[in-house]
Amino acid sequence: MAIQLSNQRYEEIKCIVVRMFVAYGVSCVPINGFEIAHKMGVKVMPYSAYSSNIRWLLIKKSEDGFSIEKTNGQWYIFYNDEKDYGRVNHTIMHEIGHIVLDHSEDSELAEKEVKFFAKYALAPPVLIHKLKLDNPES
């Protein structure tokens, strides 16, 4: 059976996204995951920065990207820069979601939460409605 988030949890995540936008001065679209990560002090590393042997291991861990926290508390997001910009930006925001939502382990619940976090952060329904956007090209 698929995990379902409660309405309360959806609302909590929406509030977390809004607080993040306020904290990091996000006030225009398109939402840039790289900029938010930079403002958070997260180091963002493309797979292409590594040798082919290491890159193979990174892709084996995740086709799109992943985040890790070093013992000193520094967060890193590694991402596959061979993907298109939209996919990369979504991956960065997805990983920011894991960091902001304080996910300490992979789980179906954590993935459900972070998928909603990234979707809401990159395309907030209120903003889409206010700007009268009705298709992806808008």
Spans of features found by a protein language model:
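Active-site hotspot residues in diverse enzymes, especially metal/ion-binding acidic/histidine motifs
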Residues: M1-S138
